[in-house]
A protein has these predicted regions:
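Phosphate- and divalent-cation-binding pockets in alpha/beta enzyme and binding domains
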Residues: 13, 59-62, 86, 92, ...
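Generic preference for hydrophobic
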Residues: 25, 76-77, 141, 234
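Conserved N-terminal catalytic core of the sugar/cofactor nucleotidyltransferase
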Residues: 2-5, 31-119, 130, 181, ...
Length: 261
């Protein structure tokens, strides 16, 4: 299987570090954020990795070359021309994700292998093999979530199926639950927590949203758009700890968190 690391962000909340570095190369507890992610994937047996780049892309490419890709097969999806958000970024990377790592040909489709998707700036203690075992190839995928305080939530029904999205600060609701006639009972708000396992059929679901929104869209937008027809389920890991290393003020806390993993 392959993994996709989202590493193209501008890292504006990590300024001034990201005035000279891409977010992926911000140092943390003796390693870069990117190295933390690659090593977690490698420890789980995943060595075929695709990652997108935009901000200081050359520095990331040079860093990978200098470190021999950390012993992995890493391919780069170049977004220097346009930052595409998570959904658009995954879509652009499709030829790399669905091709054989030996041939790099998009004609050699890996139709049955799920795609593990993660953010370079989210650290966690997640048990990746357990997550992959929970994946059902008959469904569209799993979204790692947890009950925590935030403003924006994914909404799941009593079978853990995604049925919408809400911003509790503004009252905005999107997805199937926004239809008053939709038969949903016992919904639960859960916060997205940095990782997804997706059926490669996800790529066939993107064209309609691209027609509506253009090439730039988030995976959350895509999930909400397809939730009525496709099954995406919540995955709540046991004893889960995660940290979004998104702000310069959090780096000291993140150092301690990373050291505890």
């Amino acid at each position: 299987m392959k993994a996709m690391i989202f590493a193209a962000g501008l890292g504006t909340r990590l300024k001034p570090l990201t005035d000279t570095l891409p977010k992926a190369l911000v140092p943390l507890a003796g390693k870069t954020l990117l190295q933390w992610q690659i090593e977690r994937l490698k420890a789980a047996g995943i060595t075929d990795i695709v990652m997108n780049v935009h901000h200081f892309a050359d520095k990331i490419i040079d860093y990978l070359r200098q470190n021999d890709n950390f012993g992995c097969n890493i391919q780069v999806s170049d977004e220097r021309d346009m930052l595409l958000e998570t959904g658009g970024g995954l879509r652009k990377a499709q030829p790399l994700i669905t091709s054989s790592p030996l041939t790099s040909s998009p004609n050699s489709l890996i139709t049955s292998s799920p795609i593990l998707v993660c953010n370079v700036d989210i650290l966690s203690n997640i048990d990746i093999p357990a997550l992959l075992r929970a994946y059902n190839p008959e469904e569209m995928g799993l979204v790692v979530v947890m009950p925590r305080d935030t403003q924006r939530y994914l909404v799941f029904d009593d079978t853990q199926r995604l049925c919408g999205w809400t911003n509790i600060a503004t009252g905005e609701v999107r997805g199937p639950i926004s239809n008053s006639q939709y038969p949903i009972a016992n919904t639960r708000n859960l916060a997205f927590s940095g990782m997804h396992v997706l059926n490669p059929r996800i790529f066939s679901c993107m064209d309609e949203l691209v027609a509506l929104k253009g090439e730039k869209f988030s995976l959350i937008d895509l999930y909400v758009h397809i939730a009525e027809k496709e099954v995406l389920r919540a995955y709540i890991p046991e004893n889960y700890r995660m940290m979004d290393v998104g702000k310069i003020s959090q780096l000291s806390e993140a150092e301690a968190f990373a050291a505890s993993l």
